């Protein structure tokens, strides 16, 4: 009898989840265009003047997120003067994930490089947040001709002690993880998404309507939830493998981090990176947490503009 009740409950939760997925996707439809590359289809939003002076700016989101989180407010502000390209990483937003193995910065960087090639974009300024810090660094190593400069916002770059949350370990467990993702994640997440987002902003206050404006709830779809967890649990091994190469990054790099960030500790990630990379500088923002692009968008814009000006000056000097 108990088994029958459990099975019936799981079936009901699965049906609720599938109905919830339909509602979410109707509430937050895809934007931009789908770019086909080998092994992936990436959702890309291209805004701002195509003929803007200077390199285009590519914004790449972190974990538990999608391109809308980078568009508001930073992308929209930059698009007033620059060509701005926003990309849903594979498995996030409206970019599907084809394989479980497509969770590493190296593989995702290969796909994004191919998409930028299809779009005729590059070299570009890569502006990357959190998890995508490792991706941006990897692209600068593997595809230096594509990267004119790096702006890393609260980046994750080095191995750390501890894990990434027990729930991510559970979700990436065979059989159990998918069972949970397709039954309880969406109903439970409906109540936890906004508190979780508020926590990520601390000590700053989350902007009003942030969760709805950035389609954060898309994360609750089973496939995206599984992909996000896989990204997180495989990141430590990925940065352990690539971090010894950071000294080979030659492009200008700016790291902007908050000294109150308890999600990605600057002492573990930002400071060692700027010490290792020859042409890198670190900006520590007092009292700022993990969402530096929301806490100080004007400052981030200023650093991007300064980098573009510096690249232009270097190009003119080389020509003379």
What are these regions (language model features)?
Residues 47-94:
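Conserved HGGG/HGGXW glycine-rich cap/lid loop of the alpha/beta-hydrolase fold
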